[in-house]
């Protein structure tokens, strides 16, 4: 059974959580992305759901990227780390709330989530997808507001932005390939039970 784990902030807590459940994994060496035994793959967070949907048996990713990707995967567990939120933020000196953002240009790494949010409140906006620091888009005047991940809010404050609405809460999720869920039912079920045991201990 293979695991695809996200590079970046979720990697360390993912490994620690799996180890608490007795799942010992050999990690890739140095800059390598696949472990020597082929059981562990490291991928960009946004790509983890795609790998799981298309064949890697198990993965861990944030609920933000799973929703944004719209990947068809089985999600047996919400995990107790990676907690943050996706929010709407605007310049502090031009504070506006989402209901008043008709015709605004919104910069985001999450166009699907942002579009769905503004559609749900009946506000017509232009959503612009960016891959880098979306805060820069407002500072340079190419966007009126952003929709982005917020943990402490420090990055927003450093860029003169204020959070005006929460779009969704985010946490890490356990992802399982739908075919593997059936073909490797016993193995997958054993893994889920081990992880659930760790969750119950921490409750």
UniProtKB/Swiss-Prot annotation:
Location(s), subcellular: Cytoplasm
Question: What family does this belong to?
Answer: Belongs to the ATP phosphoribosyltransferase family. Short subfamily.
Catalytic activity, per the record? 1-(5-phospho-beta-D-ribosyl)-ATP + diphosphate = 5-phospho-alpha-D-ribose 1-diphosphate + ATP
Role played? Catalyzes the condensation of ATP and 5-phosphoribose 1-diphosphate to form N'-(5'-phosphoribosyl)-ATP (PR-ATP). Has a crucial role in the pathway because the rate of histidine biosynthesis seems to be controlled primarily by regulation of HisG enzymatic activity.
GO BP, sorted A to Z: L-histidine biosynthetic process
Q: Which SUPFAM superfamilies match?
A: Periplasmic binding protein-like II
The organism's taxonomic lineage, starting at the top = Archaea, Methanobacteriati, Methanobacteriota, Thermococci, Thermococcales
Gene name?
A: hisG
UniProt organism field: Thermococcus kodakarensis (strain ATCC BAA-918 / JCM 12380 / KOD1)
Its Enzyme Commission number(s) read 2.4.2.17
User: GO terms for CC?
Assistant: cytoplasm
Name the pathway it acts in.
Amino-acid biosynthesis; L-histidine biosynthesis; L-histidine from 5-phospho-alpha-D-ribose 1-diphosphate: step 1/9
**What is the official name of this protein in its record?**
ATP phosphoribosyltransferase
- Keyword annotations of the record: Amino-acid biosynthesis, ATP-binding, Cytoplasm, Glycosyltransferase, Histidine biosynthesis, Nucleotide-binding, Transferase
């Amino acid at each position: 059974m293979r695991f695809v784990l996200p590079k970046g902030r979720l990697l360390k807590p993912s490994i620690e959580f799996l180890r608490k459940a007795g799942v010992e994994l050999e990690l890739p060496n140095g800059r390598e992305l696949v472990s020597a035994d082929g059981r562990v793959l490291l991928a960009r967070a946004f790509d983890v759901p795609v790998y799981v949907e298309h064949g890697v048996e198990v993965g861990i990713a944030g609920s933000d990227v799973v929703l944004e990707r719209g990947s068809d995967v089985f999600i047996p567990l919400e995990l107790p780390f990676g907690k943050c939120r996706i929010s709407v933020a605007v310049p502090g000196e031009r504070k506006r709330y989402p209901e008043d953002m008709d015709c605004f240009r919104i910069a985001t790494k999450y166009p699907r989530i942002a579009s769905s949010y503004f559609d749900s409140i009946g506000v017509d906006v232009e959503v612009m997808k960016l891959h880098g620091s979306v805060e820069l888009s407002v500072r340079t005047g190419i966007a009126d507001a952003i929709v982005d991940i917020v943990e402490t809010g420090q990055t927003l404050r450093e860029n003169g932005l204020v959070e005006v609405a929460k779009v969704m809460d985010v946490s890490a999720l356990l992802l399982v390939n739908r075919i593997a869920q059936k073909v490797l039912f016993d193995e997958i079920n054993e893994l889920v039970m081990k992880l659930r045991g760790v969750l119950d201990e921490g409750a």
